[in-house]
């Protein structure tokens, strides 16, 4: 087991005059195993972003723990957490968000490897990765604004795969891409997972994507994980009323 999320809760207080406590996550528990894809679905405001921030230790939960390889991430020092982040990384919905607009594509691809001391045989490994991801070498001298959405997402993948992560948190990674490019990226993710046994935590509102990618699926509603199980069961034979309505509404579109 790579990731073991146990009873995570988080609330925020809102309002200036009348303080109101809002529970954003309530008793969230799940596991993620080597080489598997766990999909998490939910509408806007379900708590997906807060969950991601807690998993990446950018936000402290009110209760519960996140264990990575059996170690409580909340108890790690900054240096220890840096080592964890080399093996647990994130792909953003908007790939440009991870790339500095004034850095060339080569500089952006090199950045994580330099940060985590993974520059051994870098040029050779980068060329292999460019070929694998179908990225033209001529793009290396360009800047993010000059690339298409599909090219940017491939760059985002390349820079992280060069540091050999064990877990990738994928936050709506194809939602900003057209259908043909989306299919290419999803196929690429599946191939990379088969080769490297990377574990994916795949966050998406698109149930078709989760059906294609995930072995297990969890449904997040108003901060609660109301249903989790095999993708076939959750998406085609849902038990919880919220999941039933979500599935019915999505596939009726």
Regions found by a protein language model. Name each.
Residues 121-138, 247-248:
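Conserved ABC ATPase "signature" region
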Residues 143-147, 151:
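Conserved ABC ATPase signature
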Residues 41-43:
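The feature captures the beta-strand-to-loop junction immediately N-terminal to the Walker
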Residues 17-19, 73-89, 115, 234-238:
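ABC ATPase NBD coupling module
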Residues 56:
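Helix-to-loop junction immediately C-terminal to a conserved catalytic motif
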Residues 64-72:
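Conserved ABC transporter NBD signature motif
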